[in-house]
Regions:
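HotDog/MaoC-like acyl-thioester-processing domains
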Residues: 1, 62, 69, 76-80, ...
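Non-catalytic linker/capping segments at the edges of enzyme domains
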Residues: 1-37
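Short solvent-exposed loop/turn micro-motifs enriched in small/polar/acidic residues
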Residues: 15-19, 65, 94-96
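Short structured motifs
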Residues: 18-24, 68-74, 85-86
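A short, glycine/Asx- and small/polar-enriched loop/turn
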Residues: 30-32, 78-83
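A short interface-forming secondary-structure element
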Residues: 36-46
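Active-site helix/loop of acyl-thioester processing domains in fatty-acid/polyketide metabolism
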Residues: 44-67
Length: 121
């Protein structure tokens, strides 16, 4: 799937309030890089970061996939800047997908959160 195709699929399957102006920067095989932006004056809440994790995991595993198990470690506060999500599929077994996601604050390029998940496609 190309970046443009993935962008369209995510926009179709992600509620508008959860998109955070998402932009697919790179989509290669099972690795995906997506940028998320805040509305000026807002800050990233943990709930917003987990929403981004869900979207980024689906970007790698398949936009119709649903998270069945999630383990997340919040490493530090996110800066009031764009967040970059790097997600990748670790293993596929039938309709089960194991994936991980890293979130980075774009302003200082530091990891903000790491998550591992199991999804059903």
């Amino acid at each position: 799937m190309t970046e443009d195709e993935l962008q369209a699929a995510l926009e179709r399957t992600t509620p508008e309030r959860d998109r955070y102006d998402l932009f697919v920067e790179e989509a290669q095989d099972q690795d995906v890089r997506v940028r998320f932006s805040l509305t000026p004056g807002e800050s990233w809440s943990t709930a917003a970061l987990l929403t981004i994790v869900d979207t980024a995991l689906r970007a790698a595993a398949g936009v119709e996939a649903t998270v069945t198990h999630l383990a997340a470690t919040r490493l530090r506060d996110a800066q009031p800047a764009d967040v970059i999500a790097l997600s990748r599929v670790i293993r596929r077994a039938g309709d089960t997908v194991h994936a991980e996601c890293w979130l980075f604050s774009h302003a200082v390029v530091e990891a903000v959160l790491h998550a591992t998940a199991t999804l059903r496609s």
